[in-house]
Every structure is written in structure tokens, then in C-alpha cells.
Regions:
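Glycine-rich phosphate-binding loop signature in dinucleotide/nucleotide-binding domains
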Residues: 49, 119-121, 181, 236-242, ...
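Short acidic/polar active-site loop segments enriched in Thr and Asp
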Residues: 20, 123, 183-185, 215, ...
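Flexible loop/turn connectors
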Residues: 217, 234-336
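Alpha-helical recognition/docking segments in bacterial nutrient-uptake
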Residues: 1-5, 67-176, 238
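N-terminal helix-turn-helix DNA-binding module of bacterial transcription factors
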Residues: 1-66
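Hydrophobic structural packing positions in well-ordered secondary structure
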Residues: 13, 24, 42, 68, ...
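Hinge/beta->alpha junction and helix N-cap segments in small-molecule ligand-binding domains
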Residues: 73-83, 101-109, 152, 163-173, ...
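Short beta-strand segments enriched in small/hydrophobic residues
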Residues: 16, 21-23, 60-76, 177, ...
Length: 336
């Protein structure tokens, strides 16, 4: 049985086109200086031979792969994460970066996928709604691969960078707003206990209540999922006395809480039960919800992430960017 022939090389293209190997390289490099006639010769020869340039090998020759590794552990049904992920991929693609995305269960750490991505010689590693062990983080550091956390700051890992919303301030502003509207019995639907994002939002909310001499809010955990939020809202609304306002630490859970309060308990949203969220996803402004929320510009978040990932060679020390937002009061907390 004859051995399969090896794929054509740049040397083969140069020979058929009658040009130098350097000319072949320039022909496939966007923006490189090369005569149009020479480039056309190279393209015709490449097509006839079935040649495709090895972009990864070319990048590695320059010391960088041009690949950003992304490990995504967020709820794929949450519009916040989908919007962020697609916006980021578009931004990095426009900048000429290649993106390799791995998904991981939200309850697992990203070690296995991080090890795989290191084999691809990624220029940087972005973690969205997932975490990494201290051992793997140290391995990334030793191999010169910077780590960036999206909207999360895990306390047990050193040497990482982060871009995050001002989560604690957002929680504080939600609490202040609910009290200003006359709500007195406040509760919270928390996220996952292992999430720094959830902890910071809940902490800011509770700290403001404490500063006003009020007790800690009643609490149920929604795990950032619709099903968890539905059960958490049911549990809270079944208590005696019932809370008159609920802060859900993201909009996705808040929308579920509104539906439970409205359709299962027959409550008028705003007047009989206030519900607030966090993130300002598109659905929050829909007439059927009109959800009060804390809004951080997605463009600002992506700007911060892209600025880091596109300038990894200049990042000598960890950077932590915190992006402020604004409270967006809507009908879901209009009691007066």
C-alpha cells in the first residue's frame, strides 16, 4: 500500500511559482509588502498544489501563538454570559487573535482544560465563571501564560489579573434603593457559595442593611440557575411573615422570581413585592418585567478584558480593573 504523500510545503509553492520562499510567506501575511503579480503567482501555485499555510507554526516562530484560551463555566442560558462571550470573541477576532473555547461544568474547576490549552501554547488564559487550582495557576505562571478572570476574583490564587463589575457597590445601591421605596423585610436569592461575584454582591447588600441597624436579610441559594431561583423564591414567599422585597444577585434569577411571585402567589410586582436584580440584561427592560437592576456597561467590561488580552507582553504585574455601574430603577420596585 503506497504511503500517503506529505502535504505540500512553502518550498513546493515557491518552486512552482518561480519565487523565493520569503515571497510565499509575504503573500500569506496580511499587510506585507509584495507585488500584486507575485502574490497572484503564489496564490495560483498554492491552489494547484492544495497548499495551506500553517498559521500556528508561523506564529510560534515569532514567539507567540496568537491564540487566547477561554474556559467558560457560566450558565449558557444566561443572556449576560452569552452577550459577553460573543462580544469578546468578535473583539479579539477583529484584532487578529484566534480563540479556543472550552466549556466546563460550573461546579468543577478548569484544571483539565487549562492543561490542554497550555499544550496549544496559548498567549493568555481567560476564565469565565469558573476557577483554577493554585497548582495549575502556578504552572501557568511558570510557563509565562497570564491568567485573567472575568468578573471574578478567587481568593486562593495568586498572580492572576481580573476585570470585574463593582459587585459590592452594586449590592449596596440595591439595598439603599429598596429601603428608600419603603420596603422593610428584605431577602436575598444568592448565587453559588463558591462564586466571589455572588459573595461580593450579597456582602454589599447585607453591609448596607447592617449600617442602617437592620438585621441580615433572609437568604436562599439559587445557584445562578432558573430552577434554583424558582425554588428559592417559593421558599422565601412561603415564609411567615413574607419578605416584601427580594434582591436576586443576577437578573436571570430575578426574572424567575418575578414569575413565581406573579403567577404562583398572585402578588402585584412592585406594590406587594419588590424584586431587583443585577447585570441589566436586555430582558430586564421588557414590559413584562421592567426589572430594577444594577447596570454596568458591557462595552466597558469588554474593553477592559480586550486591553489586557491584547497586550499580554506588557503585563508584568497582575492588574485588577473594577468597573462602576449605575442603578436602574424600574417598575419592579415601585411601591409608592
Amino acid at each position: 500500500m503506497p504511503k500517503p504523500s506529505s502535504p505540500p510545503s512553502a518550498h513546493d509553492v515557491a518552486r512552482v511559482a518561480g519565487v523565493s520562499k520569503a515571497a510565499v510567506s509575504r503573500a500569506f501575511t496580511p499587510g506585507a509588502s509584495i507585488a500584486e503579480e507575485t502574490q497572484n503567482k503564489v496564490f495560483r501555485a498554492a491552489k494547484s498544489l492544495g497548499y495551506r499555510p500553517n498559521l500556528i507554526a508561523r506564529s510560534l516562530n515569532k514567539g507567540k501563538s496568537g491564540i487566547v484560551g477561554v474556559i467558560f463555566g457560566g450558565n449558557p442560558r444566561n443572556p449576560f454570559f452569552l452577550t459577553a462571550l460573543y462580544a469578546l470573541l468578535a473583539r479579539l477576532s477583529r484584532a487578529g487573535k484566534h480563540i479556543l473555547v472550552f466549556t466546563v461544568d460550573s461546579h468543577a474547576n478548569a484544571d483539565v482544560h487549562a492543561e490542554d490549552l497550555l499544550k496549544y501554547r496559548v498567549d493568555a488564559l481567560l476564565l469565565m465563571a469558573t476557577s483554577l487550582s493554585a497548582k495549575l495557576a502556578e504552572q501557568c505562571h511558570d510557563e509565562g501564560v497570564p491568567i485573567l478572570f472575568f468578573n471574578r476574583r478567587p481568593p486562593k490564587i495568586k498572580g492572576f489579573s481580573s476585570v470585574a463589575e463593582n459587585n459590592s457597590e452594586g449590592g449596596r445601591k440595591i439595598a439603599e434603593h429598596l429601603l428608600s421605596q419603603g420596603y422593610k423585610r428584605l431577602a436575598v436569592v444568592a448565587g453559588s457559595d463558591g462564586s466571589s461575584t455572588a459573595r461580593e454582591r450579597e456582602s454589599g447588600f447585607g453591609a448596607y442593611l447592617t449600617s442602617r441597624g437592620l438585621p441580615a436579610p433572609e437568604r436562599e441559594v439559587g445557584h445562578f440557575h432558573r430552577e434554583g431561583a424558582v425554588q428559592a423564591a417559593r421558599n422565601l414567599l412561603s415564609r411567615k411573615p413574607r419578605p416584601d422585597a427580594i434582591f436576586c444577585v443576577n437578573d436571570y434569577m430575578a426574572l424567575a422570581a418575578i414569575e413565581v411571585a406573579r403567577y404562583e402567589f398572585g402578588l402585584e410586582i412592585g406594590r406587594e413585592i419588590g424584586i431587583a436584580g443585577f447585570d441589566d440584561i436586555d430582558e430586564a427592560s421588557w414590559p413584562s418585567f421592567e426589572l430594577t437592576t444594577y447596570s454596568v456597561s458591557m462595552e466597558s467590561i469588554i474593553d477592559g478584558v480586550a486591553a489586557f488580552l491584547l497586550n499580554t507582553a506588557r503585563q508584568k504585574n497582575p492588574l485588577h480593573t473594577v468597573i462602576d455601574g449605575v442603578l436602574k430603577p424600574r417598575r419592579s420596585t415601585q411601591r409608592k
